[in-house]
């Protein structure tokens, strides 16, 4: 069904239609790309002893190559904060993990990832626009600035 739809809905130049036609349907896959508004610190704070990292906290389209990088940074920074602030001698149990670790961690994570999420959404829009097909001997960013 996906192959059929791709062939029906697109008007690509040769040889792309021929390549699609020659490709086995079992070798064609697709998946939707979703964007959503950034989460807020207020929303995350409702998880008293719970936080989100990676795509659960800041999903981004795969057009900037930052999703896995940000998820790894989230995990590393959260682990470092827990190691640093939840020592047996600290009072984190009395004040709670949210105040001890999660609030500061989430604030940093949301700030750091916000530009990556926005840049990924912008890249998705750009890569699905006519400007992406512009032929020329210059960076595409120059074309965007001229036409934008």
Identify what each model region corresponds to.
Residues 1-148:
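FAD-dependent flavoprotein oxygenase/oxidase catalytic domain
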């Amino acid at each position: 069904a996906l192959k059929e739809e791709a062939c029906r809905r697109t008007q690509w130049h040769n040889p792309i239609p021929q390549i699609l036609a020659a490709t086995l349907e079992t070798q064609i896959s697709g998946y939707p790309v979703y964007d959503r508004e950034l989460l807020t610190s207020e929303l995350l704070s409702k998880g008293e002893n719970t936080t989100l990292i990676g795509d659960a906290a800041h999903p981004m389209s795969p057009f900037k190559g930052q999703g896995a990088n940000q998820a790894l940074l989230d995990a590393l920074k959260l682990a470092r904060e827990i190691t640093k602030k939840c020592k047996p001698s600290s009072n984190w149990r009395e004040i709670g993990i949210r105040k001890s670790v999660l609030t500061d961690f989430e604030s940093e994570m949301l700030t750091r990832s916000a530009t990556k999420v926005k840049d990924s959404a912008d890249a998705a829009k750009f890569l699905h626009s006519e400007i992406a097909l512009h032929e020329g001997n210059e960076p595409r960013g120059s074309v965007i600035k001229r036409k934008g």
